[in-house]
């Protein structure tokens, strides 16, 4: 399907442009830094035990299963339906591409320290031209996690070059919402070496708290081997580039769109 092929090209380009022969530490050093990353990730998870929707992507260990290598890196994603819904209510559905909350515990190639990156409120505000007041609850949830780690551990995401709709590709579908979702899933699941991680139905979550949203759903999937090659020298790519996020939504006029990070 055209939409998925274009998203898959992004993975392929990362793989082609990344160094596949990047040297990495010996097994003892890797085990030691991996333990530090695990400990940092456990702190994140201890702060989100009350959230029903959670997803963990251990990029390092998924790469090992494919006989590939990327430095220790674990992405933790969790969803707060109240926060998501209030941000999306009466605002662009494209914001959902940067929701829900995502943290990445990782180490740089050859590094000895565990680092934490996350999708900040400032990033979302810049990319979607939102007032800071709309993201107060989002920031509060972030702080409840960030307060558990040392400031020196945190790697900030630069926002100076981020403008409205920065690096977002949007494609109009020829099909209705449910058919688009079905065709995308069929295509994704038919591809070798591609893993389906899950989906998040923003409309359904909003309905539970009395907020009306147009159909909006986030699909999560990835290919560990090319992902590992891309992240080999730049593991921080695991914050937004991997896994792949494909947002499908129906706008006010009834048109169906698919959007993803370029």
Positions of PLM-derived features:
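Amphipathic alpha-helical segments
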Residues: 32-55, 174-198
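Compact, glycine-rich, soluble single-domain proteins
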Residues: 61-99, 197-198, 202-244
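A short, solvent-exposed beta-edge/loop patch
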Residues: 110-144, 247-262
